[in-house]
Amino acid sequence: MKKQNNGLIKNPFLWLLFIFFLVTGFQYFYSGNNSGGSQQINYTELVQEITDGNVKELTYQPNGSVIEVSGVYKNPKTSKEETGIQFFTPSVTKVEKFTSTILPADTTVSELQKLATDHKAEVTVKHESSSGIWINLLVSIVPFGILFFFLFSMMGNMGGGNGRNPMSFGRSKAKAANKEDIKVRFSDVAGAEEEKQELVEVVEFLKDPKRFTKLGARIPAGVLLEGPPGTGKTLLAKAVAGEAGVPFFSISGSDFVEMFVGVGASRVRSLFEDAKKAAPAIIFIDEIDAVGRQRGVGLGGGNDEREQTLNQLLIEMDGFEGNEGIIVIAATNRSDVLDPALLRPGRFDRKVLVGRPDVKGREAILKVHAKNKPLAEDVDLKLVAQQTPGFVGADLENVLNEAALVAARRNKSIIDASDIDEAEDRVIAGPSKKDKTVSQKERELVAYHEAGHTIVGLVLSNARVVHKVTIVPRGRAGGYMIALPKEDQMLLSKEDMKEQLAGLMGGRVAEEIIFNVQTTGASNDFEQATQMARAMVTEYGMSEKLGPVQYEGNHAMLGAQSPQKSISEQTAYEIDEEVRSLLNEARNKAAEIIQSNRETHKLIAEALLKYETLDSTQIKALYETGKMPEAVEEESHALSYDEVKSKMNDEK
């Protein structure tokens, strides 16, 4: 109940409504007290009433250049004028008093006094008083003062918590953490051993700067952490602060930019001022590309708010006196869009690429995230790491979290191998849709489609191994085949990429050979194949006709002018022809493989229709012997990790 009242009080509309009634009521009651039973008349009416002898008393008071006149009628008058708020019909009232204002051009005080005396009216003269002036002034100013007071109070509440007032828009929004509050250490960051080695110097400088400065060394003013999302860039920055034992100021790049001009630059100055007071300290700017994009290409023109903020950031990082002991660590996914002035030596002069972890790194990451999870004995994290190539730390954490959720839904007390297997499928392809009604014809189409991918992958197995195939719908896919690399690869050869292209074409080719139809199930296959083939031609120089030339590099930024065409129409045509040639070659290769292995292709498709999901051991048995393993034929069940381990050993 208390929270509801606070919400009502802080509602701006209710405040404005309250202030309106307050001011209106104040003015109404003030005017009502001063004018009850009285009417305002002009100078002509005043002279007429005095001449008619209907004025009993007359009081006038000089008020600057005008004369304020009031009086009492001998014979009260009746009036139907509204003197206040009327809710129904106006009432008839008796008017005994009157007021009037006489200008210097109307008459003089002596003439008015003589006229009133001649007609037997009692005249009273009041000297000009300053109190009346002050009362009128207060009546005019007090309501507006109250209005502005409440408006500023509301702006203070809406200006953000933490005691901010409406004048504090320019204060830094960074979250400050004292060294005692930072519990993250290098041991908590797994799978980034090389990256940690690059940051050791930063930690050592913050701990003992004299050891470097006496040799004339200059520690990097800024460290740029670049890498895909989820690789642990923020965690690395916290670990540096934790190991060095220094305060940590964290802020997002988007927090600098506001609709008010100059706010971003002011926040940058405020951030560095706070860091200087706490030096030595670390400033961490997450997603710095939000504020550090190249100047002159923004949507707001050449002198927009973002550019002013960037200019101030450049100035603060440029080695001004007093910045010693402050190291700026920034994280981004797109260093290619950052302003060159931000990346020059003296600012972000050290760049650390935080890449995807290898199999050992993935295993170490899994061990870190499995500390608070009860795992069964059949769970082998090394095997999970082998099955998740390309996964980053966030993906691996998500796998274990999904496994815990799956185990909870199944009312288990520990997480076993089947839970992790299901979690991997959910992360890769989405939740299964077992209740989705699929016609028998469509099931056959999907089975032969996935069997086409599988048979091509089995034949072309130089770099990748078929790990799993299923026709259980997940996400938007009717089925899928997973092929894992035999080992972590940083480089792909032209032949490896051609094999992948042929594997992607296997599904559509199988549809055409078996059913003589073309379905929409191959749309994602074509998308991946086209992207890969175009990259081979335009980025990797793998076209014999076009040669080792890169035609497409960094993509244009949002807000930048359209990039000038660096290739001719003829070259663009030749690029399209080369891409088409690669895809047709892959298609023909897939067709040749499926035609040569029609019986095996049919066996895999029929097994998929019966069991829905096949693992690597079952697929290998069908390919080599034409039969399913006997243990699996007896009963369909979720594979244990012991079975998966034996399959992985067989694949090797």
Curated annotation (Swiss-Prot):
Pfam families cross-referenced by the UniProt entry: AAA (PF00004), AAA_lid_3 (PF17862), FtsH_ext (PF06480), Peptidase_M41 (PF01434)
Residue spans, topological domain Extracellular: 33-131
Entry annotated with the keyword Cell membrane: yes
Keyword Transmembrane appears in the UniProt entry: yes
Active site, per annotation: E450
Signal peptide coordinates: none
Chain residues that bind ATP: G227, P228, P229, G230, T231, G232, K233, T234
Residues reported to bind Zn(2+): H449, H453, D525
EC number, UniProt record: 3.4.24.-
Domain of life (superkingdom): Bacteria
Transmembrane segments: 12-32, 132-152
GO biological process, one term: proteolysis
Cofactor binding note: Binds 1 zinc ion per subunit.
Cofactor: Zn(2+)
GO MF, one annotated term: ATP hydrolysis activity
Ranges in the topological domain labelled Cytoplasmic: 1-11, 153-652
Membrane topology qualifier: Multi-pass membrane protein
Family recorded in the similarity comment: In the central section; belongs to the AAA ATPase family. In the C-terminal section; belongs to the peptidase M41 family.
Function, in words: Acts as a processive, ATP-dependent zinc metallopeptidase for both cytoplasmic and membrane proteins. Plays a role in the quality control of integral membrane proteins.
Subunit structure, interactors included: Homohexamer.
Protein name in the entry: ATP-dependent zinc metalloprotease FtsH
Organism: Streptococcus pneumoniae serotype 4 (strain ATCC BAA-334 / TIGR4)
